[in-house]
Amino acid sequence: MSKPEFVYVTYIETTPEKLWHALTDGNFTERYWFGARLRSDWKVGSSFEMVRSDGTVSDAGKVVEVDPPRRLAYTFKNLSDKYKNEFPALATFVLEPYGKLVKLTLTHEGFEEGSQFYSGISKGWPAILSSLKSLLETGKPLKIPYAALKFEN
């Protein structure tokens, strides 16, 4: 049986440079990522952390690939007890310009069969990337109620 993989594709009216900034600048990520600030120097081999609004680090991993403004890849896993037996998975962002649009493809892979983390990111990524698209195109992120994501406790 093959390991699960999550792929999400969207088209955003922006430039590759603005989208790259939106994916890598912690001040910007907290505007569309449920208040989370991504923290890294974005060099291959460097640490990656997701810092919540209360200052706690909820997710951590390593930067794997950096090719601005075309490709970004990092591993990460959620640090909560719920996911303590899970391995870090690889998230890869590919940015392809098409005129006034950028095609953003996110592939998140490396999950074990039955992964609870895979189940969680499958609900989270569509909301995060929809809010990112809205913010870049309209200047306002979406206000998606956490309950709409239907995460299990």
Question: Where would I find each of the regions flagged by the language model?
Answer:
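Intrinsic-disorder/low-complexity, polar/charged segments enriched in Ser/Thr/Lys/Arg/Asp/Glu/Gln
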Residues: 3-9, 47, 58, 71, ...
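Short beta-edge strand/loop motif at the mouth of beta-sheet-based domains
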Residues: 7-8, 14, 27-60, 150-153
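Hydrophobic/aromatic beta-strand elements that line small-molecule binding cavities or substrate pockets
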Residues: 10, 60-65, 89-96
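A short, structured loop/turn motif at beta-sheet edges
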Residues: 16-17, 64-70, 94-103
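Hydrophobic pocket/interface hotspot
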Residues: 19-20, 29, 48, 63, ...
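Short beta-strand segments that buttress and anchor functional surface loops
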Residues: 47-53, 74-79, 108
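Beta-strand/loop substructures that line and gate deep hydrophobic ligand-binding cavities in soluble
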Residues: 80-126, 134, 145
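Short, highly charged C-terminal tails/helix-capping segments
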Residues: 134-153
